[in-house]
A protein has these predicted regions:
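N-terminal/domain-start alpha-helical segments
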Residues: 1-90
């Protein structure tokens, strides 16, 4: 399985990547929304872990653009935000 992690906190991204690599997943790590969008559009991923608060493009915008481009990979949103509006948007 190939997983894309889009997370701007490098230590968290690397920890998630290490855990998944130990489980034999192939992992790509990127640290901003624009680069994450490029990766998501250029490769077929089995899942995308996507932070909401990202530099350049936020996670909601990345998810919207991926869906507009008909990328069908499951997207799992990561966030510490707990507002109802954020949950609805995600």
């Amino acid at each position: 399985m190939r997983i894309l992690i889009i997370e701007d906190e490098q230590h968290l991204a690397e920890a998630l990547g290490q855990i998944m690599a130990e489980q034999k997943y192939q992992v790509d790590l990127v640290y901003d929304g624009a680069e994450g969008l490029d990766y998501g559009l250029s490769c077929q991923y089995d899942a995308i872990l996507l932070d909401v608060m990202l530099p350049k493009l936020n996670g909601f915008e990345v998810a919207r653009r991926l869906r507009e481009a008909r990328v069908s990979s499951p997207i799992l949103m990561l966030t510490a935000r707990d507002e109802i509006g954020d949950k609805i948007s995600g």
